[in-house]
Design a protein with these regions (language model features):
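His-Asp-centered metal-binding catalytic motifs of divalent-metal-dependent phosphohydrolases/nucleases
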Residues: 50-68, 74-78, 98-107
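An active-site-proximal "capping" alpha-helix that borders the catalytic cofactor pocket
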Residues: 35, 73-88
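Divalent metal-dependent phosphate-bond-processing catalytic cores, especially two-metal-ion Mg2+/Mn2+ enzymes
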Residues: 2-4, 21-47, 59, 110-187
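Short amphipathic alpha-helical interaction patches enriched in hydrophobic/aromatic residues
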Residues: 17-21, 43, 62-67, 86, ...
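Short coil-to-beta-strand
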Residues: 4-9, 48-56
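Short alpha-helical hairpin
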Residues: 1-18
């Protein structure tokens, strides 16, 4: 496990999340941190390459927190940024390609086939991470979007339902209790 790279990425992502290009607020770092945590958990559960999943999880949204103008295609730009960073850190070229594919295919809103278990782990970790960051979603709804209490609650509830529905069948089964427990807040 390249702990040196993982530690570097934690700092790099934190710094970028504090920069002027990040228009998603402080919750962006916590989202990425939760993706890395869930990615590691899923990689262990499903037998994926943990190192690739963890590194890809830390890098999956790097483009969108670096420059808001890259957001729409952040999965493509992020793969390029990841390659640049990981090459400088002398990471294995074959693993760089796996990381890039995980980043390119992580978005649930962009229908792309997940060809490897690592890609599925990162995509599922991204979707389920919203359940670890409900306060950030509420902040987004109420503070950043200026929604009423009812509108904000519906926004967050629907976001969580969409996120859960993006999961692979294996991850849905694995996270059923987390989903049900979180949904109790909205009854």
């Amino acid at each position: 496990m390249r702990e040196d790279i993982i530690e570097y990425l934690k700092k790099e992502i934190y710094e970028r999340s504090q920069g002027p290009g990040n228009k998603f607020g402080e919750g962006a770092y916590y989202h990425i941190e939760a993706v890395a945590k869930n990615g590691e958990l899923l990689a262990k559960k499903f037998g994926a390459d943990e190192e690739v999943v963890i590194i890809a999880s830390w890098l999956h949204d790097i483009a969108s927190i670096t420059d808001i103008d890259l957001y729409e295609m952040h999965h493509i730009h992020g793969a390029s940024i990841a390659e640049e960073i990981l090459t400088k850190l002398n990471y294995d070229k074959d693993k760089i390609n796996l990381v890039k594919e995980c980043i390119k295919n992580h978005r649930g809103s962009v229908k792309m086939d997940k060809l490897t278990i690592e890609e599925q782990c990162v995509a599922d970790a991204d979707a389920i991470s919203h359940f670890d960051n409900v306060p950030s979603l509420l902040y987004l709804a109420y503070k950043q979007k200026g929604m009423s209490i009812e509108e904000g609650a519906d926004f967050v509830k629907n976001k969580l339902i969409r996120s859960y529905n993006k999961l692979s069948d294996n991850s849905k089964e694995f996270y059923t209790d987390k989903f049900n427990d979180t949904m109790k807040m909205f009854k």
